[in-house]
Amino acid sequence: MQQNQKIRIRLKAFDYRLIDQSAAEIVETAKRTGAIVKGPVPLPTRIQRFDVLRSPHVNKTSRDQFEIRTHQRLMDIVDPTDKTVDALMKLDLPAGVDVEIKLQ
């Protein structure tokens, strides 16, 4: 690969344990192939809250509150080798983790 190239990986998940486990797998794989890893950096957790009326007819003041928490991690792999890219492509991550990869 070219000099001064880096791979930016952004992970998103609803479960923080899954995202931490996936980040550890990615870091271990990249370090094993000789790349320099910066991160994982925890990004702010996005919290979506929903208020729903409990009653179908009256009692407007009685509501249920639900929330969805989206956890995010960011990591950079500096000067990746071809071995690093191949190892990351073969990596099997859990289904609940969204992986976004950018080459810079």
Swiss-Prot record:
InterPro entries tied to this protein: Ribosomal_uS10 (IPR001848), Ribosomal_uS10_CS (IPR018268), Ribosomal_uS10_dom (IPR027486), Ribosomal_uS10_dom_sf (IPR036838)
Q: Which SMART domains match?
A: Ribosomal_S10 (SM01403)
Q: Which GO terms describe its cellular component?
A: ribonucleoprotein complex; ribosome
* Disulfide topology: none
Q: Which GO terms describe its molecular function?
A: structural constituent of ribosome; tRNA binding
* Pfam families according to UniProt: Ribosomal_S10
Keyword set, alphabetical order: Ribonucleoprotein, Ribosomal protein
| Gene Ontology BP annotations | translation
What Gene3D superfamilies does this protein map onto?
Answer: Ribosomal protein S10 domain (3.30.70.600)
The source's domain of life comes to: Bacteria
Similarity remark: Belongs to the universal ribosomal protein uS10 family.
Q: What does this protein do?
A: Involved in the binding of tRNA to the ribosomes.
The protein's assembly and partners? Part of the 30S ribosomal subunit.
Q: What is this protein called?
A: Small ribosomal subunit protein uS10
**Originating gene:** rpsJ
